[in-house]
Amino acid sequence: MSHRILLVDDEVDILEFVRYNLVREGYEVFTAENGAEALKVAAECRPHLILLDMMMPVMDGAQTCRAIRRNPVLKDTMVVFLSALGEEGQQLAGFDVGADDYLTKPIKMKLLVSRVQAILKRIDADRPPEKAPA
């Protein structure tokens, strides 16, 4: 079974680069360019994991993560921030709004893929993933 990942970033080059590499690893990848769009896509595709940029227009990563945690359907979805904001306080703020992990840009693909694999392995061990709505 293919895991569903929602990748959210307002930089199209990053979306395409990360999506390409995750698809090569066998994941089904959905994308959104801001938080508001991400919430709509997440409600439709029910991702196992959300990779979320912090700085975006319309709705930033912190607002998006808070909304995910308040949503009864999405609240248990794993969220990993991928952000250029790398200071300790900024990372702690990400955890404060509900992130499960925080990686800084520039993205190191091998590290990201390893982190994704580890998270999804834990998800599979904890509970069977839900099916996407028909």
Question: Positions of the model-derived regions?
Answer:
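C-terminal output helix
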Residues: P106-Q117
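Charged docking surfaces used in two-component/phosphorelay signaling
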Residues: E16-R24
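Receiver (REC) domain active-site loop signature in two-component systems and cognate sites
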Residues: M56
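Acidic, metal-coordinating helix/loop segments flanking the phosphotransfer/catalytic sites
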Residues: T31-L49
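CheY-like receiver
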Residues: I123-A134
